[in-house]
Amino acid sequence: MSSQSLYKVSGNIAANALVNNDQYKKMYQESIVNPEGFWREHGKRIDWIKPYTKIKKTSFDDHNLSINWFYDGTLNASANCLDRHLAEHSDRVAIIWEGDNASEQRKITYGELHTQVCKFANALRSQGVRRGDIVTIYMPMVPEAAVAMLACARIGAVHSVVFGGFSPDSIASRVIDGKSKVVITADEGMRGGRAIPLKRNIDDALKHPDVTSVEKVIVLKRTGGKVDWIEGRDVWWHSLVETASEHCAVEEMGAEDPLFLLYTSGSTGNPKGVLHTTGGYMVYASMTHEYVFDYKPGEIYWCTADVGWITGHSYMVYGPLANGATVLIHEGIPNHPSPARLGEMIDRHKVNILYTAPTLIRALMAEGKQHFDKYDGSSLRIMGSVGEPINPEAWRWYHEVIGHEHCPIVDTWWQTETGGILITPLPGATDTKPGSATRPFFGVQPALVDNMGNILEGATEGNLVLLDSWPGQMRTVYGDHERFVLTYFKTFRGMYFTGDGARRDEDGYYWITGRVDDVINVSGHRLGTAEVESALVSHELVAEAAVVGYPHDIKGQGIYAYVTLTRGTEESEELRQELRQWVRKEIGALATPDLIQWATGLPKTRSGKIMRRFLRKIAANEVTNLGDASTLADPAVIETLIETRLNRNE
């Protein structure tokens, strides 16, 4: 193996880990050669009401697409996260919660969490929620967010969690698409010392003329902040659970019955509702959580992701709780009120496993390691990275400053659509290279293809595809199966197209190089460029807009917008700020453009297609080798854009 920046598995870790390198190779080989046998065995890791006999019926043929796992079995996700632990671990802490203000802390045992979920599940039923209904959840990072999700799962309702940073318009589009009858929110959330007006955002979202399905809004009293109230529609969480029974039988769900919807950005602009089902997802989330983090019973596990993202679903709620872990949930941000907060929390709660994002690591790195002078970190055993590729400098800083050079780092690659981790090191099995996601998890068959779909062998670079299904895979785009087929299975026939590019080195390790479609990755969160463009163009003074990502020291990718104003409109710094606020209001803070360049024209082909590759290079300040511009209707546009570019490194 090439020794360039190789971090070898220590003998001590390999000896005590769930799998070493030889075991990984043997298990991986079996999972590919005999997937039925492999998953027949590993599907038993969760509890089934009616055991499955049929394991896998899958096809990536775009004319005959089929994704079915454990498909004649029945189960309940909530029972797998709660009930099955009660006999032996009722008193084990399930959730440790620390508020935005560190003085606010709670501990909830598995027994207590079970009671809370049962009561709230009964409360949902009292508000008319039935099996198969879609419930929208827009909550702060409090234990009740997990309670709401598990209560939905308990009674067979499908939850659709919306990230608490999204705007009323973004909430409205998701409520409309899912036709939710019930919305669950809080008066406010707390983040970085600021109150987030969640209830007000819901009120504004529900004023949208196309929102016609919502009958009830359940409101958790988090801060006691003042909220508007609509009698007959709005109801307090606490008043509902006060009288609710502590007993709630679980709904028996088919393995392929929906568990949740989660909307993700697509390149067309309309967020797509990724639909995950129950059986395969629970098997895969719990198995990846155990093996990737080398989880041992009773360990304290902290995933810093928001519950509104897939990482919060799979690795803060379903995976860890199915495995009986103690999960730390933090309401705020781990670098507030100071960069020392992350280390303080690891020490305060004796965290064994940390799963966080490169954006946070880079932000802490920029503040300087002196903030970790008082940090002990001796409890920490495994560290993970998620959301985007981690640059080698940040990887090494994470390893040295947070991990004190003794914690293996699992740099995980996966997507909302995949349900769980697909490419990752395993702590006791994989020598790591900073910046590489390394090798596939069991049952995962990655390949690299050229633009014609030809499989590339050996050390090479190409489009990252997957050749066969895995249990955690999404099943469809809600209400638009054709879009599912078109997005993932039409580009390369017989393969799942990830939308990412990657290279494979001489050791077979994968290095994710980023999106190859029109989606940008801001602070580990996917945003469709079309969404941001649509928001800009909806402003009355904007005639046209093109949005691309560009390298950003902290966020990984920043948002760079080229804007053509309507005839006669004057360019000004005030208008630039107004447009930034406009996008923030339309989509959310995450989508705010970092740089807006005025453009008298955009590089277009004669058929009117915007040539984004030129815009990406100019935004990245790579202006010496732009490539052939002869297909452009007006090549002179390029020179003007280069002269007026904003991201110069002079």
Swiss-Prot record:
Q: Which InterPro entries match?
A: Ac_CoA_lig, ACAS_N, AMP-bd_C, AMP-bd_C_sf, AMP-binding_CS, AMP-dep_synth/lig_dom, ANL_N_sf
Residues annotated as carrying N6-acetyllysine in the record are 609
* Source organism, top-level taxon: Bacteria
Per UniProt, ATP binds at 387-389, 411-416, 500, 515, 526
EC code:
6.2.1.1
Gene Ontology cellular-component annotations: cytosol
Query: Which residues does the record give as Mg(2+) binding sites?
Result: 537, 539, 542
User: What does this protein need as cofactor?
Assistant: Mg(2+)
Q: Could you state what the record's PTM comment says about this protein?
A: Acetylated. Deacetylation by the SIR2-homolog deacetylase activates the enzyme.
The residues that hold CoA are 191-194, 311, 335, 523, 584
Q: Give this protein's Gene Ontology molecular function annotations.
A: acetate-CoA ligase activity; AMP binding; ATP binding; metal ion binding
Query: What does it catalyze?
Result: acetate + ATP + CoA = acetyl-CoA + AMP + diphosphate
Extract one GO BP annotation from the record: acetyl-CoA biosynthetic process from acetate
Question: Mind listing the UniProt keywords for this protein, alphabetically?
Answer: Acetylation, ATP-binding, Ligase, Magnesium, Metal-binding, Nucleotide-binding
- Gene3D superfamilies the record matches: 3.30.300.30, N-terminal domain of ligase-like
Which cysteine residues pair off into disulfide bonds? none
Its job: Catalyzes the conversion of acetate into acetyl-CoA (AcCoA), an essential intermediate at the junction of anabolic and catabolic pathways. AcsA undergoes a two-step reaction. In the first half reaction, AcsA combines acetate with ATP to form acetyl-adenylate (AcAMP) intermediate. In the second half reaction, it can then transfer the acetyl group from AcAMP to the sulfhydryl group of CoA, forming the product AcCoA.
What family does this belong to? Belongs to the ATP-dependent AMP-binding enzyme family.
Q: What is this protein called?
A: Acetyl-coenzyme A synthetase
Record organism = Shewanella sp. (strain MR-4)
Q: What is the lineage of its organism?
A: Bacteria, Pseudomonadati, Pseudomonadota, Gammaproteobacteria, Alteromonadales
